[in-house]
Amino acid sequence: MPKLNITPPDLRRILCFVAEAIGKEEAHLNSLDAAIGDGDHGITMRVGFEAVKAKLGALDASVTIDGVLTESGAAFMGATGGAIGVLLGKMLMSAGAALQGCKEIGTSELRVLLNSMEAAVASAGKAKPGDKTILDAVHAANQAVATTAEADESLPNMLSRASLAAGTAAQNTAGMRARVGRASRLGDRVLGHPDPGAVSFSIIMRAMAEWLEER
């Protein structure tokens, strides 16, 4: 069976599919954020990915993997405000820098992508796993692929594994107290509510896995 690697045109389609998935979850993400924040997280995510989708539509057909990621990150950051705009923008741009010159995303490149994203969000957000942030989901996805034997795992299966790990980690943030950001000032009031950023990342990973599985 041929390897189902992700080409630059594939990556553009995947990110557009992610934008649609985020749009469908806008109200849910706003509801999650209303419990511990301003209630506009879903709006921010939708606006950011609408900007990504518009940017991707304007890019030349010859754009590379790193170009898709870098331009997407810049578009997301430029269209949104607040911490999540900076974090997701830097995650995408960091992944682009880490995959410079890469022609396709396979299993080894997925590891590089997630590892660079975790490093970017940890640095920009000054957070660590367990702080009830998007990092909890990113870290879980990264760990899931880091512990997978490359020879025994296809890219769709590896991405599915990462998606499941991110989803579980996002839900587990409901039992955590926030240690960074504005939510950290709410104390026990955040208990029982999952972190909206972590849930958003799990939606992104799920959409990526679904697109590749259905291709």
For the regions a protein language model found, what residue spans apply to each?
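N-terminal loops that bind phosphate or other acidic moieties
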Residues: 1-215
